[in-house]
C-alpha cells in the first residue's frame, strides 16, 4: 500500500496551536510542539534526556537511533527557547518525566486525542505531525535536506512519502510557467 500521506493544513495547524495554548498537560503540549517544529518522532521526544540537548549548539543527540549510529536533530532558536522553558527536576535526566521521575513519560495518547478533538482534527494521528514538519522542510529546502533532517536512512524514503504531497506545489509552478509562456506566445502571435 502507498505510504500514509496525511499532513495538517495551515488552518488545522492554527487550530492545533490554539488548542495547545489551552492544553492542561505541559508534557503533551511540549511534545506536540517539539514534534511539529522538528519532525521528530513522538517516542524520540518522550525519551529525550537533558544530557543529549545542547541549547547553545542548537542540537539534540539521539543516542540509540533507529539507524544504529549516533544522529542529531537540529534545533532552531525557537525550539531551544521552548526547551529552556521546560521544568527540570532534581536527579531526573528526562525532559518529559513519568510520574515517579525514574522513567520518562511513556505515551501522550490520551492527551493527543484530547488535543485533536479540541482542534477538530478529524483523522489526524500524532505521526502526521512528523509528516507535516517534513513537508514544510521539503518546501523550504528540498528533498535532500528534508531527508537528512528527518534522519531517513535512504532519500528514496523521503521521495516516496513527500513527492506525492508536492503535486499541488508542482501544479502551481506549472500554472505560473504556463501563464508566462502563453503571454509570450500571444505577444509573438500578435506581432
Regions found by a protein language model. Name each.
Residues 5, 21-22, 63-70, 97-103, ...:
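Short, contiguous acidic/charged loop-to-helix segments that flank catalytic cores in large enzymes
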Residues 7-14, 57, 74-122, 191:
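Active-site/catalytic core of tyrosine-dependent DNA strand-transfer enzymes
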Residues 51-53:
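A structural signal for short hydrophobic beta-strand segments in well-ordered beta-sheet cores
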Residues 59, 70-74, 159:
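Well-ordered beta-strand positions in beta-sheet-rich domains
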Residues 7, 64-68, 78-80, 150-176:
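Catalytic-site neighborhood detector that most strongly recognizes the C-terminal catalytic loop/helix
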Residues 18, 57, 85, 92, ...:
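C-terminal secondary-structure termini that scaffold catalytic or DNA-interacting sites
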Residues 30-33, 37-44, 111-114, 130-153, ...:
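C-terminal catalytic core of tyrosine-transesterase DNA break-rejoin enzymes
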Residues 1-42, 46-47, 56, 66-70, ...:
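Basic, Lys/Arg- and aromatic-enriched nucleic-acid-binding interface segment
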